[in-house]
């Protein structure tokens, strides 16, 4: 016979079942491997609510803290472990590079990638930057002294190169300033090794800021210098170079035609018109395969500061171990800066010209000491020391007798550039800023100088008779000498050369 369940018995059975379930749940939770929990999916994490127990308590709360407390602690712990696992899997996606926002998040079940991103390389400077036609005021202020120094060094280099090319004991004249202007105009479009080689030849610092603007400011009214680039029709010139060249040098490359004779006439006519017909024929021929021609012509239009005596005077001059008679300039009281240089063993005299120019003569102290000996001792250091001493010397009334100055010199500059160990014009020329054509050579490069100084001066000589004092300084030039036309304002050589035979 079945026993009857009393209310008390039923209550005891319910409490016993609740405790048994709670103990089994705690045992189940505590026996789980945390690693297994971490490797589970996000969906397996229990929800935070009161429905975890299979027995639903309706309207009645338990007075046994161990049952509900154990269940609550286990669930919170599981939530924390699951959340930490989720965060660990999601973190790699948060560490993606900022410049790749389109990449998808990393899957939590996938192993992390071991591939490393390629290293970021610094941007490289273009091999052929566009011509720089701008400079700052601060760079402009410092560039004048730098350019003056460079032109002075370049002058000595050129002197020895011209001397090595010319025949012994012959006259020569050139304009360092004018040649530097032409080469710097080429430098405007040079790239790679051609650019650095030109900078070395010209004694420029690397990437010389404002050199083009400073050269333009160095122009003198007493000197007329013209440069021009001519090219064949098949050579396309970049617009950037044309614009920069026109802005900085007042000229842009001119295209030649198919007729060689017409091209020769075009070039010589241009030179004559731009030198006031002082130079009428710069070229006597032009190669049939001409692609690029560099031309430069310069002449002196300045005059003496004081007029020399107008009467004709002939005097002796030492030429090739014999004395010849040559026309002389003379003045009984010409303002002159004068001293003897022991390094060159030379008398150094400086005469003033118009337009802040001066004419410097270096002549051996005695007939036994020759001009060739002076040339061997001439280097940039000695040259600068002489010019510095002249700057500090006073002009004093001096008896002057010297040959009339008339020198005309024409020179193939390609041979001069090779003497300077610059071979780019004929072998490995890079003018990427001027043209895209990689196969380019300079067909011809010519430089012509005309230098003439007669008795005429800016200021007339006094009409009254001048008595010569016994202690008056004397400067007589009666043997071969080295000369220099110096810009006193900007301190650089405009002309340089030598005179062996004043009659030539």
From Swiss-Prot:
CDD domains, alphabetized: serpinG1_C1-INH (cd02050)
Pfam families: Serpin (PF00079)
Coiled-coil portions: none
Site (Reactive bond): 470-471
Composition bias, Basic and acidic residues: 40-55
Site (Reactive bond for chymotrypsin): 469-470
Subcellular localization(s) per the UniProt record: Secreted
Main localisation: secreted
Ranges annotated as biased composition (Polar residues): 24-33, 58-75
Record: glycosylation sites: 75, 83, 107, 243, 356
Biased composition (Low complexity): 100-125
UniProtKB keywords: Blood coagulation, Fibrinolysis, Glycoprotein, Hemostasis, Protease inhibitor, Secreted, Serine protease inhibitor, Signal
Region annotated Disordered, chain positions: 23-75, 94-132
GO cellular component terms listed in the entry, alphabetical order: extracellular space
GO molecular function: complement binding; serine-type endopeptidase inhibitor activity
InterPro entries per record: Serpin_CS, Serpin_dom, Serpin_fam, Serpin_sf, Serpin_sf_1, Serpin_sf_2
Signal peptide: 1-22
Gene Ontology biological process terms, A to Z: blood coagulation; complement activation, classical pathway; fibrinolysis; innate immune response; negative regulation of complement activation, lectin pathway
Complex formation: Interacts with MASP1.
Family note: Belongs to the serpin family.
Function: Serine protease inhibitor, which acrs as a regulator of the classical complement pathway. Forms a proteolytically inactive stoichiometric complex with the C1r or C1s proteases. May also regulate blood coagulation, fibrinolysis and the generation of kinins. Very efficient inhibitor of FXIIa. Inhibits chymotrypsin and kallikrein.
Protein name from the UniProt record: Plasma protease C1 inhibitor
Gene name linked to the record: Serping1
């Amino acid at each position: 016979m079945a026993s009857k369940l009393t209310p008390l018995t039923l209550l005891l059975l319910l409490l016993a079942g609740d405790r048994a379930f709670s103990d089994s749940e705690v045992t189940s939770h505590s026996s789980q491997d945390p690693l297994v929990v971490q490797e589970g999916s996000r969906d397996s994490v229990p929800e935070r609510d009161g429905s975890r127990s299979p027995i639903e308590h309706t309207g009645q709360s338990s007075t046994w803290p161990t049952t509900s407390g154990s269940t609550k602690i286990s669930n919170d712990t599981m939530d924390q472990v699951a959340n930490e696992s989720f965060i660990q899997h999601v973190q790699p996606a948060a560490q993606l590079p900022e410049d790749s926002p389109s990449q998808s998040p990393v899957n939590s079940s996938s192993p992390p990638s071991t591939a490393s991103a390629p290293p970021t390389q610094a941007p490289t400077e273009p091999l052929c930057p566009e011509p720089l036609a701008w400079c700052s005021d601060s760079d402009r202020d410092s560039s004048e002294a730098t350019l003056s120094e460079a032109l002075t060094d370049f002058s000595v280099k050129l002197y020895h190169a011209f001397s090595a090319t010319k025949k012994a004991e012959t006259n020569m004249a050139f304009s360092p300033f004018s040649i530097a202007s032409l080469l710097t105009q080429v430098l405007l479009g040079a790239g790679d090794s051609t650019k650095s080689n030109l900078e070395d030849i010209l004694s420029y610092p690397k990437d010389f800021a404002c050199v083009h603007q400073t050269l333009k400011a160095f122009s003198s009214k007493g000197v007329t210098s013209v440069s021009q680039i001519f090219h064949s029709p098949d050579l396309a010139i970049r617009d950037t170079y044309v614009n920069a060249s026109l802005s900085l040098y007042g000229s842009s490359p001119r295209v030649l035609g198919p007729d060689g004779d017409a091209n020769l006439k075009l070039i010589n006519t241009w030179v004559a018109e731009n030198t006031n017909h002082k130079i009428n024929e710069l070229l006597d021929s032009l190669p049939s395969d001409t692609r690029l021609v560099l031309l430069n012509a310069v002449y002196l239009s300045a005059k003496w500061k004081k007029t020399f005596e107008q009467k004709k005077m002939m005097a002796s001059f030492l030429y090739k171990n014999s004395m010849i008679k040559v026309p002389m300039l003379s003045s009984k009281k010409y303002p002159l800066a004068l001293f003897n240089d022991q390094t060159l063993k030379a008398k150094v005299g400086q005469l003033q010209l118009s337009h802040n120019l001066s004419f410097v003569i270096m002549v051996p102290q005695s007939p036994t000491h020759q001009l060739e000996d002076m040339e061997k001792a001439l280097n940039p250091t000695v040259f600068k020391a002489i010019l510095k001493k002249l700057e500090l010397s006073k002009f004093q009334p001096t008896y002057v007798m010297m040959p009339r100055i008339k020198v005309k010199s024409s020179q193939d500059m390609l041979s001069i550039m090779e003497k300077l160990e610059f071979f780019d014009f004929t072998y490995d020329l890079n003018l990427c800023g001027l043209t895209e054509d990689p196969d380019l050579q300079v067909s011809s490069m010519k430089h012509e100088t005309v230098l003439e100084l007669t008795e005429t001066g800016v200021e007339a000589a006094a009409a009254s008779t001048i008595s010569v004092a016994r202690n008056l300084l004397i400067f007589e030039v009666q043997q071969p000498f080295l000369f220099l036309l110096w810009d006193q304002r900007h301190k650089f050589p405009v002309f340089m050369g030598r005179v062996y035979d004043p009659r030539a």
